Amino acid sequence: MKLIVSVMPRSLEEAQALDATRYLDADIIEWRADYLPKEAILQVAPAIFEKFAGRELVFTLRTRSEGGEIDLSPEEYIHLIKEVAQFYQPDYIDFEYYSYKDVFEEMLDFPNLVLSYHNFQETPENMMEILSELTILNPKLVKVAVMAHTEQDVLDLMNYTRGFKTLNPEQEYVTISMGKVGKVSRITADVTGSSWSFASLDEVSAPGQISLASMKKIREILDEA
């Protein structure tokens, strides 16, 4: 289980002020570029990639329809992703498949896609269909984050993940039950078959995130013989 921490600067000045040494315990950095005005993203990109040079990095534009901070037309979304990919080669690129399915074909040349689905309202009844459709597309990683309201919501997602991982051992998954009741899904990633778990440093990027320090301790305990 790799631990991912998001950076969410809201300006070039905030990006330049980031102290990369505070993120050394994170295995992967996620740049949530949606916290910036869309016209500032490409201006801030050099500072982010210089700051975290040599680190694994996920480039993410989380749109409002999936719980993020930005609204982008399909053309704007694809343009920003392609520009960042061309000039900075992030290790992973998050792609909101269900929000931008109509332009997905333009991303087929990218081998490092994280195909993602986010639902901040509920754990939908068609989770099996969602996981199945994303798996068939054979991305680098399938990411599903849904809101849990009951313990059964959490158990359902964990069981679906374990089942899909068993049937597709070469496919990497990240599944998250958001919210307080879903915290257990964040610490049992290795059991359910998730490759990553998201943690927070100063600011959470999703409900129910656990601090990086706590997640590191939990991982150490779980890794003990």
UniProtKB/Swiss-Prot annotation:
EC number: 4.2.1.10
Superkingdom field: Bacteria
CDD domains linked to this entry: DHQase_I
Pathway recorded for this protein: Metabolic intermediate biosynthesis; chorismate biosynthesis; chorismate from D-erythrose 4-phosphate and phosphoenolpyruvate: step 3/7
Keywords of the record: Amino-acid biosynthesis, Aromatic amino acid biosynthesis, Lyase, Schiff base
Catalytic site: 118 (proton donor/acceptor), 143 (schiff-base intermediate with substrate)
GO biological process: 3,4-dihydroxybenzoate biosynthetic process; amino acid biosynthetic process; aromatic amino acid family biosynthetic process; chorismate biosynthetic process
InterPro entries noted in UniProt: Aldolase_TIM, DHquinase_I, Type-I_3-dehydroquinase
Binding-site list for 3-dehydroquinate: 6, 30-32, 62, 186, 205, 209
One Pfam entry name: DHquinase_I
GO molecular function, one term: 3-dehydroquinate dehydratase activity
Substrates-to-products reaction catalysed: 3-dehydroquinate = 3-dehydroshikimate + H2O
PANTHER family per the UniProt record, alphabetical: 3-DEHYDROQUINATE DEHYDRATASE (PTHR43699:SF1)
Self-association and partners: Homodimer.
Function per UniProt: Involved in the third step of the chorismate pathway, which leads to the biosynthesis of aromatic amino acids. Catalyzes the cis-dehydration of 3-dehydroquinate (DHQ) and introduces the first double bond of the aromatic ring to yield 3-dehydroshikimate.
Protein family membership: Belongs to the type-I 3-dehydroquinase family.
Name of the protein this chain belongs to: 3-dehydroquinate dehydratase
Organism: Streptococcus pneumoniae (strain Hungary19A-6)
Gene name in the database record: aroD
